[in-house]
Amino acid sequence: MTSRRQPGHARPLSALTEYDMAAFNTERVLSVHHWNDTLFSFTTTRDAALRFHNGHFVMIGLEVEGKPLLRAYSIASANYEENLEFLSIKVQNGPLTSRLQHLKEGDTILVSRKPVGTLVVDDLKPGKHLFLFGTGTGLAPFMSIIKDPDVYERFDKVILVHGVRWVSELAYANYIENELPNNEFFGDVVRDKLVYYPTVTREPFRNQGRITELLENGKLCADIGIPQINPETDRAMICGSPHMLADISAMLDSRGFVVSPGVGQPGDYVVERAFVDK
């Protein structure tokens, strides 16, 4: 997988034909939104028995020639929402994504019945600020997390940092900036605590540069108006390309942060271990 292909949202697994079809629900596509020529999202029905933690992922796919063609996708919808939502890149020759990008309303898709993952708030130690570092479609799990009222009770500030190449790749920007703060149930706390910091690398924008650069030179925290990131007060969640995961993890480690070693073991930051290339 190259750095342009975001983990958690189109990741190949081996021995796909061994999957038991009984482990999947068949869901119906309700809507499809194409953000640009490389990025799209879609919503589906949700089986009433499906339960997950915000930040979890599922296997989704299509039945091709009688066999399931599957990839791991983070769930972009919150665990209390009626439908499921997913964010995906378009890969012209990708075994699954080349087919998924042509989904239309009414089509069916396979969704695994057992969501899993290590990118969950429960595995973070208490802190003051929660940083959500995502690149590309690594935004997906954080969309579910910023819609979780419990997250805002745990932290004074929730800082969503989304790094992309082009402005058109800033999926959900309007929702984050204008719709979520007006949520009828918890919009007031979103307005008070959520900080959205999109940054672009390949064209002019109000914030420019890679996330790692903005952390290392201090610009990100200075722009937000908080002290530089430190393990005494700050917690982090990371989702993106393997290169980005490695870089930010190394930077946090060098500053004294300790990663959660596994499910049920709190740390200063968490990553989705299933998507970290060995």
Which residue ranges define each predicted feature?
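Ser/Thr-glycine-rich phosphate-binding loops at phosphate-binding pockets of nucleotides
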Residues: T135-P141
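Short helix-loop-beta connector
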Residues: L124-H129, P231-E232
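Reductase modules of NAD(P)H-dependent flavoproteins
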Residues: R4-G8, Y19-A23, V161, S168-K278
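A short, basic/flexible loop-to-alpha-helix module at the beginning of a structural domain
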Residues: P115-K125
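Histidine-anchored nucleotide/phosphate-binding helix
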Residues: P141-E153
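Generic structural signal for buried aliphatic residues
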Residues: V58, I109-S112
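Conserved beta-strand elements of the Class I
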Residues: L130-F133, M237
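Ferredoxin-reductase
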Residues: R5, P12-E105
